[in-house]
Amino acid sequence: MWAEGLGGLERFCSPGKGRGLRALEPFQVGDLLFSCPAYAYVLTVNERGNHCEYCFCMCCFFNNVFQSSQKEDWPMHKLECSPMVVFGENWNPSETVRLTARILAKQKIHPERTPSEKLLAVKEFESHLDKLDNEKKDLIQSDIAALHHFYSKHLEFPDNDSLVVLFAQVNCNGFTIEDEELSHLGSAIFPDVALMNHSCCPNVIVTYKGTLAEVRAVQEISPGEEVFTSYIDLLYPTEDRNDRLRDSYFFTCECQECTTKDKDKAKVEIRKLSDPPKAEAIRDMVRYARNVIEEFRRAKHYKYILYNAPPSELLEICELSQEKMSSVFEDSNVYMLHMMYQAMGVCLYMQDWEGALQYGQKIIKPYSKHYPLYSLNVASMWLKLGRLYMGLEHKAAGEKALKKAIAIMEVAHGKDHPYISEIKQEIESH
């Protein structure tokens, strides 16, 4: 085991969960439990030209720091630069393939244990191979084929079975790095962060400072308590959350939130009508909502809709689905909120600031009710609202919203995080 360990924390065997992380000392809300540099990471293709590929910073991309960053990242930069030149416009490996290529390169360059692996090594990651269905196995084989296709001249590969294990490990243990508005920046592996088990009422939150993951308490944690993070978006009711957990992580959550289902009624709130909808009508509408959400998720993933339909048609789909669901669901129902959030995103893309603001105003109150107290989803919504208000010359409302975002982010990100300094500057500059 890595000699340093993590101060105030220990790896232990969590009953019914396997490996876990446990506190050895008390932590207060906002305390930094530990930080973990990325073992391997990759900037998403869409952010090239906006962020430094070495540190994910925006500012160093536009000044002299970029040259030193590029020098530091040269071994990984070279891994992609040469094949990009060779393949040109045909260079299109998935982010998972790119990340896995970097892991293989890192293992060759740095075979010994790294500072990212103080309590958990990459080779110890769970793969859940025995739980993969044929569809997931086929996807992994497609990724392996892409890895060979794009990187065969620049990497040495282990045998196919070893690559299957590695891709399965990356799928279960990879992290998405997001900015202050929860926009996707890239993907990474943080071994010690991956040691934490999941709960739908987590006591810590993971945020990022460039390619460094930071874990802070969002509840008081006593010595002997297990440290829990959340692997998923907590907006949805128990059944939906566990469907996602089973599909991606191969377990069913048994936390207090999932056992009591206390918030489910409010999350799937039904309209109060003189002639209340029947149980069958409610079930049908829930089924419709889940199907619409899944269709949108797939469309966004494959970019099908963006290539085949203008944004106005996307917005129409959002509006029609809301109209249909509103015959049964209240506006505070999470399925309604999901489609409102999608609509807000389309409005932002179309630069329809008034439309985006109207959706954000509808979303923020139920978000604050459904999500935990220190939620990044709530903070990012306040942040978007604040920036919209400021842009539309509603300074007082904008300042109020931005300060609400800061109050959450000071706990989740830490008071010294660059994002918070930037938001404070936004307030001062108006």
Where are each of the predicted segments found?
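Short alpha-helical interaction motifs and adjacent low-complexity tails used for partner binding
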Residues: 1-64, 68-430
